[in-house]
């Protein structure tokens, strides 16, 4: 596998409102633990669309991994000015991750017009990656459901790699990191 999309819940869907909240440490560690074996097996690109939450945390993780591994980060935003209505802290976070990217493009080269641009994003990313890693629990629907449904279809039709990190997997990392010996 040469390329993987990483997506999942937006931070506010998880009740997290700061990029560096305590919970983010566990989320980033979980993403890292799932990406690292893929990177060691030859993964070359991680693709995100620059959404708040899981995607930007994944971008931070890839930036850390780039210090030791030949991994690259691509940000394929669904439309221009995606972060225009975000608060200043979130715009800053998005720009910090964008500066670490090896590639950046807009899937539709115009500002937001309709939800169809999100569907276009999902289709383009799935069609141009070998798999997807989602922080998504099937028991708690949210915005990742649309990407998940489309990726599941690709898995069934074209042997697309699909891995979901659910809340149990996140809790295992929390427990592991908090163990005292």
Swiss-Prot record:
- Coiled-coil ranges per UniProt: none
TM stretches of this protein: none
Matching Pfam families: YpsA (PF06908)
NCBIfam families (alphabetical): PRK13660.1
Give the record's family classification: Belongs to the UPF0398 family.
PANTHER family, per database record = UPF0398 PROTEIN SPR0331 (PTHR38440:SF1), UPF0398 PROTEIN YPSA (PTHR38440)
Q: What is this protein called?
A: UPF0398 protein LMHCC_0668
Species whose genome carries this gene: Listeria monocytogenes serotype 4a (strain HCC23)
Q: Which taxonomic lineage does the organism of this UniProt entry have?
A: Bacteria, Bacillati, Bacillota, Bacilli, Bacillales
């Amino acid at each position: 596998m040469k390329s993987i999309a990483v997506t999942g819940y937006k931070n506010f869907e998880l009740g997290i409102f700061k990029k560096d909240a305590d919970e983010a440490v566990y989320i980033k560690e979980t993403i890292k633990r799932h990406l690292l074996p893929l990177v060691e097996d030859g993964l070359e690109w991680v693709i995100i669309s620059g959404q708040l939450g899981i995607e930007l945390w994944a971008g931070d993780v890839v930036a850390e991994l780039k210090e030791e591994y030949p991994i690259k980060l691509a940000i394929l935003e669904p439309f221009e000015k995606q972060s225009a209505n975000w608060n200043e802290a979130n715009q800053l976070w998005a720009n910090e991750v964008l500066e670490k990217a090896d590639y950046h493009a807009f899937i539709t080269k115009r500002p937001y017009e309709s939800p169809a641009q999100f569907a276009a994003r999902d289709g383009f990313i799935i069609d141009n990656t070998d798999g997807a890693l989602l922080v998504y629990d099937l028991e708690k629907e949210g915005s990742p459901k649309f990407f998940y449904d489309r990726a599941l279809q690709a898995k069934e039709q074209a042997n697309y790699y699909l891995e979901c990190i659910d809340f149990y997997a996140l809790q295992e990392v929390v427990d592991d990191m908090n163990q005292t010996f």
